[in-house]
Regions:
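Charge-rich, low-complexity N-terminal segments
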Residues: 1-84
Length: 84
């Protein structure tokens, strides 16, 4: 049940990236996850649906992409933000 904290971190990274790149509307976020990340996509999307309201990510979707090459401590990273 750590998806809430993970979602908050994704949103913090996304907000900072949006400001830095003058993006007003983020519409897609791609997260790469390793085989041992233990991220449940349904729970992550549940938290994201709640937390994104009223932000530059209000219309965004999150996609998880499995990456078997991620090993060790780092089992997840934000791969792509798309917006305008």
């Amino acid at each position: 049940m750590h998806e809430g904290a993970v979602c908050r971190e994704i949103m913090d990274i996304g907000s900072a990236a949006a400001v830095e790149n003058e993006i007003k509307n983020v519409y897609e976020i791609v997260i790469s996850v390793g085989p041992y990340s233990c991220i449940h996509e349904g729970q992550l999307n549940f938290y994201f649906d709640v937390l994104r309201k009223g932000t530059c990510m209000a219309d965004a979707v999150i996609h998880l992409e499995k990456d078997e090459s991620l090993t060790g401590v780092s089992q997840m990273y934000v791969k792509t933000f798309k917006g305008e």
